[in-house]
Amino acid sequence: MSAAANAEHGAADRVEILPVPGLPEFRPGDDLVGSLAEAAPWLRDGDVLVVTSKVVSKCEGRIVAAPSDPEERDTLRRKLIDDEAVRVLARKGRTLITENAIGLVQAAAGVDGSNVGSTELALLPVDPDRSAATLREGLRERLGVTVGVVITDTMGRAWRTGQTDFAIGASGLTVLQGYAGSRDRHGNELVVTEVAVADEIAAAADLVKGKLTAIPVAVVRGLRLPDDGSTAHRLVRAGEDDLFWLGTAEAIELGRRQAQLLRRSVRRFSAEPVPHDAIEAAVGEALTAPAPHHTRPVRFVWVQDSETRTRLLDRMKEQWRADLTADGLDADAVDRRVARGQILYDAPELVIPFLVPDGAHSYPDDARTAAEHTMFTVAVGAAVQGLLVALAVRDIGSCWIGSTIFAADLVRAELELPDDWEPLGAIAIGYPEQTPQPLGPRDPVPTDELLVRK
């Protein structure tokens, strides 16, 4: 039966939470089903048996011998956390928030030293859903009853202080009740409501089980939850769907590492306008690039007037066409080369970087004068790269085109700029045209022959 067949997970009636007292201190290899059948012969069809994962771990042999010395015990605990975790989401002090092999996100990969001997540590069950199914089938054979089973562990919750019990294993019930398409009593359609029923049961049962009561098992009675074949694994949100895939500090660190790799040359733009404050902010960040002699060797000219842009690009195209024709290229080849500049017409915004020699040192010889000019050119290049990256981290595309370098006098004349301002290309800016798959960070380039060591 599907979850949709059950219109409401709430009982709208009396629900009981019953303790299961008299259970022994479990050890590896103990018969958990037999102990439960003996302690709770009163189980009925439809009951939900809620079992603390520590009990399952003990019976399944997920107990590790540990030193009694606190420091040595903590060292082992941290090694076990590393072994159990597949990734670390966040760190705060010595606390690690991890994901384990079955996708559970919690502190310390579920490695725990509570409710075990002082020379032991407990690991989570390897497959809690399978453990739940085994318990359910065993009780059906021993007592002739059909129950649901939820295996629980204690975790914290995003946005909330404190911990509560969650379902990490389940069998024989609806673990997730969807209400999308249903209507409330006022006729309002429920759009995204989806209730983690198994988690609600886990939390409710903990009101009876507690932490210090020596009651590791409780029974929730009075719910009407059909077995839709789902398990607790369905409650695990995969990393790619998780809005909190990393902790804050880790997300910031990842963003810093990936910022450079987000930049790529975008040649097709959408018509969506780019907010002016975003461009201003990106330029401000770009201007923090290193520069010689504490100077400001770069100016970014933002060509905002459409008539000015068209006139400038038309004149550059005419000169470029004349130069290529003089080189002996045929008309088709000239057209193909000139067409590459169409991006500067089409981009929503156009910014031209200029080298400005303010503060450059003067030298009596050509060699040092040329070196000074090269130094300023490198500084402008650093600022240009900074601008491209600053745009990319805002999801704004860009493409650096070198054409203005070949028409410096023309560019200065059209934009009415001083004679010592040197254009160093042009930057087309805009939001990238939609693609079937969003473009993520690029892979770093192999350094095999490009990083020379001496």
Swiss-Prot record:
InterPro entries, A to Z: F420-0_g-glutamyl_ligase (IPR008225), F420-0_gamma-glut_ligase-dom (IPR002847), F420_FbiB_C (IPR019943), FbiB (IPR023661), Nitroreductase (IPR029479), Nitroreductase-like (IPR000415)
Documented EC number(s): 6.3.2.31, 6.3.2.34, 1.3.8.17
Location of the region described as Disordered in the Swiss-Prot/TrEMBL record: 432-454
Residue positions binding coenzyme F420-(gamma-Glu)n: 323
Binding locations of GTP: 23-26, 53, 58, 115
Residues that coordinate or bind a divalent metal cation 2: 154
Alphabetized UniProt keyword annotations: GTP-binding, Ligase, Magnesium, Manganese, Metal-binding, Multifunctional enzyme, Nucleotide-binding, Oxidoreductase, Potassium
Residue positions binding FMN: 263-267, 291, 402
Region entry Dehydro-coenzyme F420-0 reductase, spans: 248-454
CDD domains per the UniProt record, alphabetical: FbiB_C-like
Cofactor note: Binds 2 divalent metal cations per subunit. The ions could be magnesium and/or manganese.
Binding positions for a divalent metal cation 1 per the UniProt entry: 112, 153
Region: Coenzyme F420:L-glutamate ligase, residue numbers: 1-247
Cofactor(s) of this protein: Mg(2+); Mn(2+); K(+)
Pfam families in the record: F420_ligase, Nitroreductase
Family note: In the N-terminal section; belongs to the CofE family.
Function: Bifunctional enzyme that catalyzes the GTP-dependent successive addition of two or more gamma-linked L-glutamates to the L-lactyl phosphodiester of 7,8-didemethyl-8-hydroxy-5-deazariboflavin (F420-0) to form polyglutamated F420 derivatives, and the FMNH2-dependent reduction of dehydro-F420-0 to form F420-0. Is able to add up to six glutamates to F420-0, producing F420-3 as the major product with lesser amount of F420-4,5,6, consistent with it producing the polyglutamated F420 compounds present in Mycobacterium smegmatis.
Protein name: Bifunctional F420 biosynthesis protein FbiB
Species of origin: Mycolicibacterium smegmatis (strain ATCC 700084 / mc(2)155)
Gene name of the encoded protein: fbiB
